């Protein structure tokens, strides 16, 4: 039994070293710039949006709660503390994305190609949005990082990865996932 405990302790410490090394590499890459940084909006309880959804009326949308707002602050703090250079922050027009961007970064621009296409109402927009996202990235020549605050479905489609709320997903300009960082809520 004692041998099993020793093996378990060694395994856990090696796992933590590997994880820390990977995280250090991710941070180094972020600090160099030239990355796409997708952020799934911070925690907003529930799933999807109500049937009466109106893009101009936040009361008809699923929104951040206090936990999501705190998570947004943690996202901003992560970028500041790690001195991650940013060219531009762009966001979906959905209120939960705008609020995440506003709290974490203050300044941002809205881009409709980052809007959700989760519901049947918006699913028809998926192909055009992905084309426009790729065109935008192709024309981006920033030396720092491009931050994209968006939705699960957009990130999943763009980089083939399923992010948690508030998760940071790093990709290159070819949308190859380079790493991810989870921000607790």
List where the protein language model places each region.
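Sec/Tat signal peptide C-region and signal peptidase I cleavage site
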Residues: 16-20
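Glycine-rich phosphate-binding loop signature in dinucleotide/nucleotide-binding domains
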Residues: 82-84, 140-144
């Amino acid at each position: 039994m004692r041998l099993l405990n020793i093996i378990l302790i060694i395994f856990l410490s090696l796992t933590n070293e590997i994880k820390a090394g990977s995280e250090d590499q991710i941070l180094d890459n972020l600090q160099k710039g030239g990355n796409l940084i997708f952020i799934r909006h911070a925690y907003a309880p529930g799933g999807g949006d109500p049937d009466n959804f109106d893009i101009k009326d936040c009361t008809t949308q699923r929104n951040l709660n206090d936990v999501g707002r705190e998570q947004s602050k943690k996202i901003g703090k992560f970028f500041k503390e790690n001195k991650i250079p940013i060219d531009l922050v762009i966001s979906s027009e959905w209120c939960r994305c705008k609020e995440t961007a506003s709290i974490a970064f203050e300044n941002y621009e809205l881009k409709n190609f980052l809007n959700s296409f989760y519901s049947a109402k918006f699913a028809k927009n998926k192909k055009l949005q992905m084309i426009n996202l790729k065109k935008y990235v192709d024309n981006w020549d920033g030396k720092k990082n491009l931050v994209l605050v968006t939705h699960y479905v957009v990130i999943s489609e763009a980089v083939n990865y399923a992010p948690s709320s508030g998760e940071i997903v790093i990709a290159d300009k070819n949308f190859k996932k380079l790493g991810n960082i989870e921000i607790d809520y």
